[in-house]
């Protein structure tokens, strides 16, 4: 059964081994699916709750985020909104930086942020106190840079970090526990991070999601949002074995370090 979460009315539906498909609740028992990589979990929740699918939001083109769209559309046409990217094989309504995605009949609307780095066309949806950011920002971590540069990714993460602190962040994967192991390696004296690690361990032991996470917490525990903090800069420079200059270079060093971290 999906796990309900607060703010906006959002349900977490699990997919594959660690993906989350977020279902945004709308009036008249309608749901908006965010990044449905699989159709079956969404269909199961629609059947369980008697809800109907009102729309689909896509953050990027990776198969584990769009793989269920065609099957869901086979049950009936719904509005699909996502980035302009030829690797998304179905016809969708494309949006980009500065656009606003409105659902007047649902009383919902989201601002579109272009956040390149994980992929070049990656977008995020921000509205109603919630941020749906796909694989750009994770709790205590961030996505790998499959296409973008460290400067692009750092700029994207900085934009998300600077959204209102009470914003709840809904990302695409349950990576929090593993991310916290790295965060405490990069910043071992951060008591907020160690406290969060213990809380996440309890949640996961109870088979509960660690998400959503407020940006106010991410600013305190996520090393990839803290590249200007002296302790994080020093740890990155020590790992690189040389002085580092700008925050984007600190970020790039941290990301490369995390890529090899076990």
Which residues make up each language-model segment?
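Conserved beta-strand hairpin/beta-sheet module of binuclear metal-dependent hydrolase folds
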Residues: 2-52, 123-137
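Active-site HxH/HxHxD metal-binding segment of metal-dependent hydrolases
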Residues: 16, 30-31, 38-113, 195, ...
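Divalent metal-coordination and catalytic microenvironments
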Residues: 24, 35, 60, 72, ...
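Active-site metal-binding loops of divalent metal-dependent hydrolases
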Residues: 36-38, 61, 85-86, 118-119, ...
């Amino acid at each position: 059964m999906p796990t309900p979460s607060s703010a906006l009315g959002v349900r977490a539906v699990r997919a594959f081994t660690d993906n989350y498909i977020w279902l945004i609740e709308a009036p008249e028992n309608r749901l908006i699916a965010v990044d449905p990589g699989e159709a079956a979990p969404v269909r199961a929740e629609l059947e369980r709750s008697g809800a109907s699918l009102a729309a689909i939001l896509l953050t990027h083109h990776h198969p584990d985020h769009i793989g269920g769209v065609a099957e869901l559309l086979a049950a009936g046409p719904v509005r699909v909104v996502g980035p302009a990217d030829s690797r998304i094989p179905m016809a969708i309504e494309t949006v980009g930086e500065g656009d606003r995605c409105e659902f007047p009949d649902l009383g919902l609307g989201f601002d579109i942020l272009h956040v390149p780095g994980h992929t070049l066309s990656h977008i995020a949806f921000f509205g109603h106190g919630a941020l749906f950011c796909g694989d750009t920002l994770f709790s205590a971590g961030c996505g790998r840079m499959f296409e973008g540069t460290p400067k692009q990714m750092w700029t994207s993460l900085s934009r998300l970090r600077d959204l209102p602190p009470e914003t709840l962040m809904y990302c695409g994967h349950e990576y929090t526990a593993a991310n916290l192991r790295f965060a405490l390696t990069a910043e071992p004296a951060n008591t907020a991070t160690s406290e969060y690690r213990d809380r996440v361990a309890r949640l996961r032991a109870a088979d509960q999601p660690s998400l959503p996470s407020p940006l106010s917490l991410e600013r305190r525990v996520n090393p990839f949002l803290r590249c200007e903090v002296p302790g994080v800069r020093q740890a990155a420079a020590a790992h690189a074995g040389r002085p580092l200059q700008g925050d984007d270079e600190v970020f790039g060093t941290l990301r490369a370090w995390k890529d090899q971290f076990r």
